[in-house]
């Protein structure tokens, strides 16, 4: 009799546990990161009786999370790639939208400038035409400055985004480390049973962290997560969270970069090429590969235009018979010394041939008693040796070295980064416009003006290979093509994430129809065991009533 009652009670308890699990699944349907749970039942140990081994019902061995580590890892890898591509595309599309605006583009302003110059060539002695050219010159310079400032502001926004990302990463690392500690303690208290709700919270935090910076998860005994970034830097070790810091770059203090906080060595800058996944990797890649290239190409165009126009303008004579002067002011190359340099060397830079200057920054480093120069846009490296006067020439530039370098000293050379910010129109008096080719040729002499106009179609003015219009058109086209490619790549990777997410949810997600079915099934199971208990009670009453 007791066996019958015990079996029924074990069934009732198991049914109650299964109903609780099903109801918890249903109530948690909309909870982000929730993993479907299943009540696991097992046979109780049998008892040897007169007729052999007799069953003793059922017991609940645990509540299992329906979790597939392989699919989850695949999903994380896809998500961090998708997040990076999306972040890069969003930033790139801003540049594309800005450059493709036809009503206020550089192409429009430059065309207006040369149209005004054409009018002046046809009416070289007309003061109104001369004044109109000065006005169009100022409009062109203002458009250069507006475009450049937009890109500079975007650079500042990248700095802010890096700082915000680092704060989020540190916050997630602390929360995951805390959950590691709680899970470890509660698993011990629960005799090996894990707190499923905390496991879900931890996995959700890892997923969100992974979308900021790609991470890899290794599981210790006891279920503790150790988390490293894809570059090998540890973020979480058991219950200990490591920290990152957003710091000024030693190569360029105007830029924020990511450093690993080491208790002994302090802040160790992480090479940005190692941070290439997640939204943080996306914005870093955007800055180094897209934003820098756009700014440098724009600066190269401004430098080539201003210097070519100045050179030709100085070859002519103005309305007063005086030799022409510089028409435009333009910024000079910038050389940034790495803050970690040990030597006392200094480098100065000047432009010797604006048409040969390339749209790239350079890293100049001293190693093995040699100066190595790397074009950052193409990642090509070559060796240079200063002459007796400490001078080196390449790519339309001349560098002057003074002082004594130490091993691993480095500099960043930016030939055109400040070209536009310091650009201006120097000619404010219309009589100073040098249209004539000879000193006393008269107001109607327009030969130097024609030479200035011919610069528009010179195919070797920018980078030795393009005209002004072609260079700008190429920039707009390159940006548009790259943006379109990123859009496609982002959408494709998003589809991969969706497919893997659906696959993961088919295992771990809650299906309401399935849970409704489970409720009915376990309700019948509960009622059946209750019927067994009722039968046992009836038998017991019958035995009691025997007289």
Curated annotation (Swiss-Prot):
Tell me the PANTHER family matching this sequence: FLAGELLAR HOOK-ASSOCIATED PROTEIN 1
Q: Which UniProt keywords apply?
A: Bacterial flagellum, Secreted
Q: Which Pfam families match?
A: Flg_bb_rod (PF00460), Flg_bbr_C (PF06429), flgK_1st_1 (PF21158), FlgK_D1 (PF22638)
* Biological classification of the source: Bacteria, Pseudomonadati, Pseudomonadota, Gammaproteobacteria, Enterobacterales
Tell me which InterPro entries the record gives.
Flag_bb_rod_N (IPR001444), Flg_bb/hook_C_dom (IPR010930), FlgK (IPR002371), FlgK_D2-like (IPR049119), FlgK_helical (IPR053927)
Q: Please give the name of this protein.
A: Flagellar hook-associated protein 1
Gene transcribed to yield this protein: flgK
Main location group: secreted
Similarity field: Belongs to the flagella basal body rod proteins family.
GO MF, one example: structural molecule activity
Q: Localized where?
A: Secreted; Bacterial flagellum
**Single Gene Ontology BP term?**
bacterial-type flagellum assembly
* Highest rank taxon of the organism: Bacteria
Cellular component GO terms held in the UniProt record: bacterial-type flagellum hook; extracellular region
């Amino acid at each position: 009799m007791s066996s019958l009652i015990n079996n029924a009670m074990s069934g009732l308890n198991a049914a109650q546990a299964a109903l609780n699990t099903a109801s918890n699944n249903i109530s948690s349907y909309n909870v982000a990161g929730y993993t479907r749970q299943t009540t696991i039942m097992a046979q109780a140990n049998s008892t040897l009786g007169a007729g052999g081994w007799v069953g003793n019902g059922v017991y609940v061995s645990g509540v299992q999370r329906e979790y597939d580590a392989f699919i989850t890892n695949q999903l994380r890898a896809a998500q961090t790639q998708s997040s990076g591509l999306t972040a890069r595309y969003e930033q790139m599309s801003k540049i594309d939208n800005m450059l493709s605006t036809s009503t206020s583009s550089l192409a429009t302003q430059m065309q207006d400038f040369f149209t005004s110059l054409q009018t002046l060539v046809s009416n070289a002695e007309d003061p109104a035409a001369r004044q109109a050219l000065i006005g169009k010159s100022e409009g062109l310079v203002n458009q250069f400055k507006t475009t450049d400032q937009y890109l500079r502001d975007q650079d500042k926004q990248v700095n802010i985004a890096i700082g915000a990302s680092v704060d989020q990463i540190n916050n997630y690392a602390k929360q995951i480390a805390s959950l590691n500690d709680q899970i470890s303690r509660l698993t011990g208290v629960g005799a090996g049973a894990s707190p499923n709700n905390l496991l879900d919270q931890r996995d959700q935090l890892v997923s969100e962290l992974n979308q900021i910076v790609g991470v890899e998860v290794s599981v210790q005994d006891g279920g503790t997560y150790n988390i490293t970034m894809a570059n090998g830097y540890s973020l979480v070790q058991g219950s200990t969270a490591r920290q990152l810091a957003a710091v000024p770059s030693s190569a360029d203090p105007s830029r924020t970069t990511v450093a690993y906080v080491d208790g002994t060595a302090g802040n160790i800058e992480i090479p940005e090429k190692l941070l290439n996944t997640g939204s943080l990797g996306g914005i870093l890649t955007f800055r180094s590969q897209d934003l820098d290239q756009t700014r440098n190409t724009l600066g190269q165009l401004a430098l080539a235009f201003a210097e070519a126009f100045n050179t030709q303008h100085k070859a002519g004579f103005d309305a007063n018979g005086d030799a022409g002067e510089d028409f435009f002011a333009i910024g000079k190359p910038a050389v940034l010394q790495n803050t970690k340099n040990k030597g006392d060397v200094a480098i100065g830079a000047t432009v010797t041939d604006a048409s040969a200057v390339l749209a790239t920054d350079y890293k100049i480093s001293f190693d093995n008693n040699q100066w190595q120069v790397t074009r950052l846009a193409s990642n090509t490296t070559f060796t240079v040796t200063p002459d007796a006067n400490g001078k080196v020439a390449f790519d339309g530039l001349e560098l002057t070295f003074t002082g004594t370098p130490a091993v691993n000293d480095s500099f960043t050379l930016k030939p055109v980064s400040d070209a536009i910010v310091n650009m201006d129109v120097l000619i404010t008096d219309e009589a100073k416009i040098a249209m004539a080719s000879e000193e006393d040729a008269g107001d109607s002499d327009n030969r130097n003006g024609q030479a200035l106009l011919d610069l528009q179609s010179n195919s070797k003015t920018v980078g030795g290979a393009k005209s002004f219009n072609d260079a700008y058109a190429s920039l707009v086209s390159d940006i548009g093509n790259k943006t379109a490619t990123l859009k496609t790549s982002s959408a494709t990777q998003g589809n991969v994430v969706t497919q893997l997410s659906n696959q993961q949810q088919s295992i771990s997600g809650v299906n309401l129809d399935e849970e409704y079915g489970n409720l009915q099934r376990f309700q019948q199971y509960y009622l059946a065991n209750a019927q067994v208990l009722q039968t046992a009670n009836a038998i017991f009453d019958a035995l009691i009533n025997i007289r």
